[in-house]
Amino acid sequence: MLKLDFIDWLSYKDIFPFEGVSTTFAEFCAQYSAVQTNWAYTYAAIIGIIILLIKKNKKWYWYLFLALYSVMSVTSVGMHTANYGAFEPGVLTTKLLASFVDMSFTELTAWCGVCSFAMEFYQSKDSLKKRNIFLIGVTSIMVIVLSILTYEVFVMHDRPLYFGGGGAPMDGKTGGMSLAEVGCVITVLPILYLIIDNFKKMTSNERWILILAVSVMLVAAIITALWGDNEIADFALGNFHGHSTWHMLGALVELIVVFWVDQRTTNKLLNNK
């Protein structure tokens, strides 16, 4: 069953007098916060691209990664604006379709990020075979995850939160992760292998920058898994939204990675002189 339910995205000014709006004000604030903070991805991606261009960095794969990150931001805005986050289990709603587009680009961005790190670490002729095997493996994981997502949306018409959510529907009321979301995490995990395998080959400053990026991403992942999109946490007198924090910390990770890429490129140029 297909149910398209796009409605106007309202501002704080006209949310209450608008007829037909069934969402609570807290839910509206949560989704509105998610929309606004989501643009941090785009800003960080654009700033990152500008930094790499100014530094005349020629590594095309990082530009592709940042470009995907900026597009992912736009698709995520659509995810949070579709009918204020409404899901109906068993119904192919606009929100569910929006989540498909959003999750697809999230997975593609994660895949591109892992591939970029692999291409960064394995550049010598001796490591090309290892790099290609790694890229094929990560790409296979990406295809599997997108297949699972497609099954969830277009066959099940639902994305239950099996991990940490007890199988609850993806309605933003509880924390937890769906199969495709867990698959996205699995897609990113090979980065840990890349870091461990190349840790001693990096300079001290490269290591610390990368450790910072991984640490921030880990904190962001834990925070967003604890609360649903519609939940306003009790922290800070009810002014804390977990998913919005995920957006902002994710944007911070983007910039940290850009600084790491620039530092690594600069170190190589200095060593070649």
Where do the PLM segments sit?
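Early transmembrane hairpin module of multi-pass membrane proteins
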Residues: 2-126, 130-131, 146, 207-211, ...
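Alpha-helix capping and helix-coil boundary motifs
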Residues: 59, 171-174, 194-203, 207
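Membrane-proximal helix-loop-helix units in multi-pass membrane proteins
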Residues: 90-195
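Alpha-helical transmembrane segments and terminal signal-anchor/GPI-anchor hydrophobic tails
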Residues: 152-163, 186, 200-208, 212, ...
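Non-transmembrane, juxtamembrane loop and terminal tail segments
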Residues: 272-273
